Amino acid sequence: MRIALAGNPNSGKTTMYNALTGKNEKVGNWAGVTVEKKEHPIRNIYCKNGEEFVAVDLPGAYSMSPFTAEESVTSEYINNEKPDAIINIVDATNLSRSLFFTTQLLELGIPVVVALNKSDVNKKKGNYYKRFLAFGKARMPCC
């Protein structure tokens, strides 16, 4: 089972990928650190049927209609390789920037989990993120 990690640049996708896989891929607090997709089995998941779960770290994107080479990698992977599920990593400190991309992902018919990252920082900004939690079919506060 392939699980794509998708979201805006600098939302925490690679940090999540490293936590799931045990890898140590480069992270930074600026856009453009991840420029190609990376795949690795998720550690500590055991299935009776032997199925392997693989995390796919995708470059940041603001839209499924690409404007940059990095967005093209993300859009082409999701549209052509059809992951089994998508974890949409959303920066809780800037929710409005993520809504368009999240909406596009939900319209694809692929199961989506919205993972709010940096929610500890957002608590200082008030409760705006509670409105986002009601958005979509699946939601999961994270990190």
Residues covered by each model-derived region:
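Conserved beta-strand scaffold positions in the cores of enzyme catalytic domains, especially
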Residues: A55, C142-C143
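Short alpha-helical
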Residues: S11, A69, S96
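Short glycine-rich substrate-engagement loop in P-loop NTPases that contacts/grips substrate
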Residues: S63-S72
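Conserved G1/Walker A P-loop phosphate-binding module
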Residues: M1-S63, E81, A85
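Conserved C-terminal guanine-recognition region of P-loop GTPase G domains, centered on the G4
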Residues: R43-C47, V73-P141
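Conserved protein kinase catalytic core
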Residues: E25, S63-M64, R97, K123
